[in-house]
């Protein structure tokens, strides 16, 4: 269900579509409210958002099944607003034990990061304030990365695009081969492909790659986006 393609008038039992397409009134109004018996939502932690709610309220007789690996939202909103019960839970420790996920080895970099002036928004630190608080430590962090992950394929998460771009430059000065990608990058697909193939050994981003991206060769993740 996208662009000029529609399931209406067809005999398909399953329809795949994005919420961005379905939430449009011009498309939604073509359907009878009882058209779907069941709606399955991937990345279901987004189901509370306005777009999903518009679709779910329109098809209000459908059963709803949500699937997500990250049910805990940063704004602390409860998915119980949409889903009545938890059908199945597969925990992180169990997935590691059964070999589906890599065991995590966490290392804390000893920074005396002052977050006292960082404000709060939607239950978490404000990204703009974090940028200011983190900025003086970027060179020190690059030095620590040279100790811990000089030969690893590394993804770095930062609070803002400008911080991500600045840290990319700092890493390149420090001897890494770093790239940066964000939602506005016209060459995003090319950068991701080059990182996957080994052209870059560090990829910086501002929380862009938190879902919908897979790169099994990554063996180090640096989180420079403090959360509560």
Residue ranges and their predicted role:
Residues 1-11, 27, 165-169, 176-210:
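Conserved helicase ATPase core of P-loop NTP-dependent helicases/translocases
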Residues 5-38, 49-54:
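Conserved helix/coil segment N-terminal to the catalytic DExD/H
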Residues 15-18, 62-69, 202-205:
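Structural recognition of the conserved hydrophobic beta-strand(s) that form the central parallel beta-sheet
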Residues 20, 44-46, 210, 227:
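Catalytic acidic motif of RecA-like/P-loop NTPases
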Residues 34-37, 201-205, 211-226:
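A short beta-strand element within the Helicase C-terminal
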Residues 37, 45-106:
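Post-DEXD/H (motif II) to motif III coupling segment of the RecA-like Helicase ATP-binding lobe
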Residues 86-155:
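Conserved interdomain linker/interface between the two RecA-like ATPase lobes of SF2 helicase motors
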Residues 153-160, 179-181:
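Conserved RecA-like ASCE P-loop NTPase motor core of nucleic-acid helicases/translocases
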């Amino acid at each position: 269900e996208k662009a000029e393609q529609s399931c209406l008038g067809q005999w398909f039992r399953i329809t795949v579509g994005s919420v961005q397409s379905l939430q449009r009134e011009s498309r939604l109004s073509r359907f009878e409210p009882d058209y779907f018996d069941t709606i399955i939502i991937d990345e279901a932690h987004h189901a509370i958002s306005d777009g999903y709610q518009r679709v779910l309220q329109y098809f209000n007789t459908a059963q709803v099944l949500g699937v997500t690996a990250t049910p805990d939202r940063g704004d602390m909103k409860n998915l119980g607003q949409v889903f009545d019960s938890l059908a199945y839970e597969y925990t992180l420790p169990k997935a590691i034990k059964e070999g589906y996920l890599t065991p995590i080895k966490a290392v804390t970099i000893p920074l005396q990061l002052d977050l006292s002036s960082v404000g709060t928004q939607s239950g978490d630190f404000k990204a703009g304030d974090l940028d200011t608080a983190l900025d003086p430590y970027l060179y020190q962090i690059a030095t620590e990365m040279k100790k811990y992950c000089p030969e690893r394929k590394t993804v770095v998460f930062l609070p803002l695009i400008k911080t991500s771009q600045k840290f990319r430059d700092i890493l390149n000065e420090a001897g890494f081969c770093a790239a940066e990608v964000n939602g506005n990058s016209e060459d995003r697909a090319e950068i991701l492909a080059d990182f996957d193939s080994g052209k870059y050994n560090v990829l910086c981003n501002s929380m862009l790659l938190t879902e919908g991206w897979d790169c099994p060769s990554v063996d180090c993740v640096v989180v420079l986006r403090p959360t509560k």
